[in-house]
Amino acid sequence: MDNQEIKLLLIKKLNLEQANITGDSNHIKIIAIGNIFKNVSQVKRQQIIYAPLIDMIKEKHIHAVSIMSYTPEEWEKTKK
C-alpha cells in the first residue's frame, strides 16, 4: 500500500479533514487533522490512527509509524 492509499484509508475510516503521509514502508510519518481528536489524549489519538493500519503493521507492510495528530484548531495554531 502506498502513501496515497494510506492517506485515503485514514481520511475515509476516521473522517479526517486532512492527512499527510510521507516516508516509505519501513517508516511512515503521519500528520492527521480532524475533529475526531477533540478532547482526546495523545495516547488515544495514536490508538485511533493505528486502528485502521493494524493489519498492515502486523503483516509488516508498515514497519514503523510516526504520528502527529491535531484538531483543526490546533493545526491552525501550529501553522503560524
Curated annotation (Swiss-Prot):
Tell me which family the UniProt entry assigns to this protein.
Belongs to the BolA/IbaG family.
Q: State the protein's name.
A: Uncharacterized protein BU385
Q: Which organism is it from?
A: Buchnera aphidicola subsp. Acyrthosiphon pisum (strain APS)
